[in-house]
Amino acid sequence: MKTRILRYFKHLGLTILVLLLILIPVGISEGAQVSYGHDSASLNFDGEGPYVFYKNDSLVTVKYIRGNKDDGFAIDEKDFSVNQPIPAEVYFPLDQTKFNFTIPTSFETPRSIYRDNKKILAISDIESGFKTFRDFLIRNKVIDENLNWTFGENHLVLLGDFVDRGFSTTQVLWLIFKLEQEAKKQGGTVHFILGNHELKNMYGDHQAASLKYTFVASMLGKTQSELYSKDAVLGRWLSSKNVIESINGTLFVHGGLHPEIAALNMSIPQINAFMRKTYYEAPYPKVDEDKKEFLISSKTGICWYRGYFKEDLSQEEVEKPIKKFKANAVVVGHTLHFSVKKFFEGKVYGIDVKHSSDYHKNWPDYDSEGLLITNGNYYRAMADGTLKKL
């Protein structure tokens, strides 16, 4: 009897081992990770902010969270005229990083097409990871150690999904906001192209947001949707952004370009204008569906489409929208890859990779990557600042 029991557990152990040997590589190939070693600093709310809301046409209210769970929390708030510079400070609890800037309260819609032959550095799907975003920019000489813009007249393309999942959404967005202003002063450009997760936060789908922001909104006396509404500075700023841009002959979109876009009688600026009207609407099928509706669909839309990697597209189908917009290639995020890669004979570049998390360790862990385009050549931009030609 004892021998039979031992034999049973031996077979069971071998079966489990074999399953693990099969499942672990499969899981890793799909981007699965095991998280451990969570840092409690993620729940440090002291100094969280700023959260800036329009009080009326002439005033905004700036709010910060102060305190801790032992002594309680309070809101530090102050009103400012929309006509004066609004000083702001952002705090990152993990390593006590702080940065300062001023907040304007009105925003211009960016251009959709750029031609200047300057360098382009693109990165996507940071998902609220402030540290990995900051460190990548420092090592690739976009900013200095004090988080100041050093990329001159060049282009930094942020290809969507910089929010959700992590604990540093506020810090990430304000760093982008700050760099956008600094780049402009030097003749450079920060292109924040919206992804599906920015849109989700705007139309009220917060399932992928960290639970932290449920409490943040409650402390501020707001709902989570109000953090990015048209009555919030971050909301108005996001709503000014594009979903597609052409920079020096390369297209940038978060999801991808469905082949049917080639049949639409719409330019890139017209697509952005149409999409901008829908940012605060969840995508849903309509009875009297306009043929432009597939642009916002959660399957075929510009911010959602995964067809380059999930469908059996021909080279001709892939190239139709690229040729329509007189471009050489399209760069996309949204669909995860082990590294920045080119597809379809160099017509598609996928740049969504796994990035390290701010407040917990992962196994396996991954280094960030981006895409550098210069002099017509495409390179993997590595986390340590080195380049690898594609």
Q: Model regions: which residues?
A:
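Feature recognizes metal-dependent phosphohydrolase scaffolds
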Residues: 2-390
